[in-house]
């Protein structure tokens, strides 16, 4: 059971949320008094409480979601809060629904979406994974961070062929290596205020690191927001090549590192927005005509469940008509379906852009 000091902090946080009339987070929407009373004294076997779940959203009232899972068990123990938030965010993934089993499908169904190279600047597919037997960031000890990093780096050092590469720990990294990784846009920084408030950045930079292959088309982040972020990317529009590389990497890593998986929610991640397939397939794409007709762009994006962001990701502008466009849906469909929906949408956008020229 949670101790008295934690419960007192929770009561205070709940009052703050209640008083914040302009707060629009899913946390505020679904943390009703009855849900709060039901969960405030619960504690996972690793010692995580409701405070670990909600503290980022309490501190940052401008959060969109406002909750994180401190460990895998939290998704079950605090389900009365997580389930409605998951249903709301992953439109229509109801509390009775079950995420399908992993299915990368026929990898040869994916193509180069822009063979002429006129529209797509680069293509990227990533997924997140958590290592079984370890909690998520807020509950990890310094020793666990080190242990996880050594497991990950030794697993990655066994990769062969085009996945073969080098692991760079953030601890003790030289300025030269750091600058090189920044120039390649590979280096991740210490978490933003949302992650800081969720206690996701403790013992930084212990246990954190970056692996990339020699061609710089395959990347693994160790202990950034999730235990593992596995990323495949390259210039141009060859989604097929990018997807096949990711699938072979995930399968290779999975042979050596067991991943946390939930019967109902799929692959588990620190943030509930990434659950399920955890897959985000995206392109940087130039659409000058559609950029001038934002309504049409949003209409097509809506039809194919695409998320349109500015050039540098969330909350940024499109520079020179370049957008970051990705699949929006991660839950209740297979990996294959998520990426296929994105491919169909991008092909349609390019077709319309050509017609408008």
UniProtKB/Swiss-Prot annotation:
Residue numbers binding L-arginine: 64-68, 225, 271, 314
Please give the catalytic activity noted in the UniProt record.
L-arginine + ATP = N(omega)-phospho-L-arginine + ADP + H(+)
N-acetylalanine is found on: 2
Q: What EC number(s) would the UniProt record show?
A: 2.7.3.3
Sites binding ATP sit at 122-126, 185, 229, 280-284, 309-314
The family database entries (CDD domains) matched by this protein are listed as: arginine_kinase_like
What molecular function terms (GO) are annotated for this protein? arginine kinase activity; ATP binding; creatine kinase activity
Q: What class of enzyme is it?
A: transferase
Q: Which GO terms fall under biological process for this protein?
A: phosphocreatine biosynthetic process
Q: Give the record's family classification.
A: Belongs to the ATP:guanido phosphotransferase family.
State the name under which the record lists this protein. Arginine kinase
Q: Which organism is it from?
A: Callinectes sapidus (Blue crab)
